[in-house]
Amino acid sequence: MERDLEEGKEKKWETISRLRKPYLAALGGQWDVMKSFFEKNRKQLCFQMTVEKDTAFHIAAYSEEKDLLQHLVELLPDSSSLFEALNKKNTHGNNTFHEVATTDGVETAEFLVKKLQGVYRPDERKLEDLLKAKNNLGETPIYRAVAHGQTKMAKYLSDHSCGDLSSHFGRKDKMSILHIAVIGQHFGLSDLSYCLTFKLLNI
């Protein structure tokens, strides 16, 4: 067992080492270098680049680099791999939407939503699975948008989430979405949280 663990660590560091060039490019904001690297190494698009298991998609999302994220999506080998790429989770359990949700990049979220709809329509389950996915704390992307005070993002994502909305209303420690909005003094979002609650209850 110990040997297996050591071999696993070696493989992980070997993978990260191979992606050192785009990682350093990301640190320096050299997004064209990242684009160029993955144009030549498309099979590594979903490989982890950091010790926290961030892929290029995570990095593009939380760096608020819409053009880079669009470029990476277009480099995917086929449209059916889109869900897999966006659903890949890092150490914190965050997928790409969890990372986009913490920014004010509504246009980025809109691009991803439309891309998913274009690929999988009329089946909306792939999009819904991504929006309802919970990270290690039990947070959905909508919950994270509220927690980070991203009013427009929270509204946009909630408008595109269908079915049961209750999964967005709390996390593992029982902190409600309304409570987190008030604690962060995101009062506009506390109003949105009320609206979501009313929508859930059909009020």
Predicted regions and their residues:
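Ankyrin repeat (ANK) tandem arrays and their immediately adjacent linkers/low-complexity segments
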Residues: 1-203
